[in-house]
């Protein structure tokens, strides 16, 4: 029986690398994975999942209004799929997370979701909130703070490297804008 998995972490913990390894494992066994990523995240090019260590794969895009159940069912009917791999899942809507539960429950296809748990203010993203609520399995991927402790928070920085404590929830960026830190250093950076 298929299940939905949510692999979550702060930035730079290897979520995309883990997704790409999963895709390779399925392909190595002659199976056909289907990869999606958020259209909003074009840091490494449109329609690609890329990792910091240089791995990449082509991916279908999801937008805020994409009906994932319909798209996946249509692609699965044309060519059977053995798993769905979703990158940047923090950008999913509540409805899209529900659609992914339908892929698992009605199409019996495993769905592996990868994304950030919280934003730079320590607040849950909508997609992450519902994945934490509805996924069958939750797997935390770990990275480390500069002090050596587990990093579970993300700081957004300005062009001078100073921590920012206000702004839009979504601002696409990588190491140029975000730093993963432990809770203690998060609070210190924001003066809390």
Curated annotation (Swiss-Prot):
Active site, UniProt feature: 88 (proton acceptor)
Record flagged with keyword Transferase: yes
Record-linked Pfam families: TK
A biological process from GO: DNA biosynthetic process
Keyword Heme tagged: no
Binding site for ATP: 9-16, 87-90
Catalytic activity, as annotated: thymidine + ATP = dTMP + ADP + H(+)
EC numbers, comma separated: 2.7.1.21
Protein name as annotated: Thymidine kinase
Organism listed in the record: Vibrio cholerae serotype O1 (strain ATCC 39315 / El Tor Inaba N16961)
